[in-house]
């Protein structure tokens, strides 16, 4: 199981009571006096960890360099209150989403909460691993939303990192460079991958007894969102025929969905989509026993609810 998945599961298990107490749904966030932006997954949708902050030159005043002020939900009050971070002229800011990610889905995917009277231009890059970066354009003049589809980003990759670079529009004043209050994922997602051996016996589609502990832990992560769509994807190795593997993965997905419907029944409103890939989306060559084990998995991706995307269609 990938390290990120283990880390997320650990956080969810040790903090289950807190998560349940903080159940949220979609929320409107104020942009200015007249406008808001809607984030369908609410307060979990924000970057919450500083990776790197390189102050530009000239640098902003020291009071405008508190890197914690760009994490979590936006809290901007006015320009005289330093509850945002200034990059300085040419400065860079790299942030991470640790308990969720974002991906290219319908509509805008990312929103940069830039504040202050003047809105500087910024270069935006995203990464799935914090190493390989993809350019996703620049924002300026108060236009702070990004649609990854405009940059031919695939629809499968979940991204966890955002890097912002000030483009040196304004290089004077106490808050020189772009001023960032928060970075939010409009199309926020939670993706978890589960080793099929943890859930099923070999070539079987009935959940083993211990599988329920794993799925209960995953349900805990979903408690913080009371309305969403769960995409459940089944994957196998290449042993057997393609038809057999697709059928097996479909049955396994159905078993997972049936159990999740029970444990989430009193929590909120959820839709479920089953996608049986069989052997068609391996993450490793099926040439060793270890690699085949990696390919035998069930993936659960929590995305915004269907009625959110339907509302985008109505607007268009």
Show which residues each predicted segment covers.
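Predominantly extracellular/luminal cell-surface or secreted proteins
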Residues: 125-129, 235, 303
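Soluble non-cytosolic domains of exported or imported proteins
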Residues: 88, 118-119, 174, 205-213, ...
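Bacterial Sec-dependent N-terminal signal peptides
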Residues: 1-23
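Periplasmic peptidoglycan-binding/tethering modules of Gram-negative envelope proteins
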Residues: 184-229, 265-266, 302-316
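Periplasmic OmpA-like peptidoglycan-binding domain that tethers envelope proteins to the cell wall
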Residues: 236-316
